[in-house]
Amino acid sequence: MDLKDCKIYLVTDEKACNGKDFYKCIEESIKGGVKIVQLREKNISTKDFYKKALKVKEICKNYEVLFIINDRLDITQAVEADGVHLGQSDMPIEKAREILKDKFLIGATARNIEEAEKAQLLGADYIGSGAIFGTSTKDNAKRLEMEDLKKIVNSVKIPVFAIGGININNVWMLKNIGLQGVCSVSGILSEKDCKKAVENILKNFN
């Protein structure tokens, strides 16, 4: 799977599943058209993160979609994921690239042109930018204005994915601005039918 083939990017949050089976939600999302899954876990032990990552990797492998780990290079290497996503407060991109070589993808969060250009220069393979519509899954996420998102897209050559409160009702606003794709958390996982949610987001984005 190539990044250029990826339109819908799922970022996980088990709480967003609202009691539905976490792994089933991921599988149904992939069936709907998700091409990248990022496992994001902030408050569990390394051992539990590792176990969870192995299960999610198995699902991704079965459907031949990309599997990304949030923040943790050790888990990324241990489960042989496809890559790691690094926020501004995570390990520096250049250090991660030095450790991972070219065997893994590196995604980076960028909220302005400077961060985006720096991420590209330091070896990031793609950028995640937001929060474009605000978000319920990150307490400290500041909203990114549409004009600023467009500037980020135009400032780099690597793929850019928008993130933050994206769902079936607002994704159409992100059409035709040069994005590679969109990331969603609750816009997919909190819906009753995850597969249908992805299909509808994809339909409204294309």
From Swiss-Prot:
2-[(2R,5Z)-2-carboxy-4-methylthiazol-5(2H)-ylidene]ethyl phosphate binds at T135, S136, T137, G165, V185, S186. The keyword Nucleus does not apply. One of its GO terms (cellular component) is cytoplasm. It holds the Pfam family TMP-TENI. Pathway: Cofactor biosynthesis; thiamine diphosphate biosynthesis; thiamine phosphate from 4-amino-2-methyl-5-diphosphomethylpyrimidine and 4-methyl-5-(2-phosphoethyl)-thiazole: step 1/1. It catalyses: 2-[(2R,5Z)-2-carboxy-4-methylthiazol-5(2H)-ylidene]ethyl phosphate + 4-amino-2-methyl-5-(diphosphooxymethyl)pyrimidine + 2 H(+) = thiamine phosphate + CO2 + diphosphate; 2-(2-carboxy-4-methylthiazol-5-yl)ethyl phosphate + 4-amino-2-methyl-5-(diphosphooxymethyl)pyrimidine + 2 H(+) = thiamine phosphate + CO2 + diphosphate; 4-methyl-5-(2-phosphooxyethyl)-thiazole + 4-amino-2-methyl-5-(diphosphooxymethyl)pyrimidine + H(+) = thiamine phosphate + diphosphate. 4-amino-2-methyl-5-(diphosphooxymethyl)pyrimidine binds at Q38, L39, R40, E41, K42, N70, T109, K138. Its cofactor is Mg(2+). Binds 1 Mg(2+) ion per subunit. Belongs to the thiamine-phosphate synthase family. NCBIfam families: thiE. This is Thiamine-phosphate synthase.
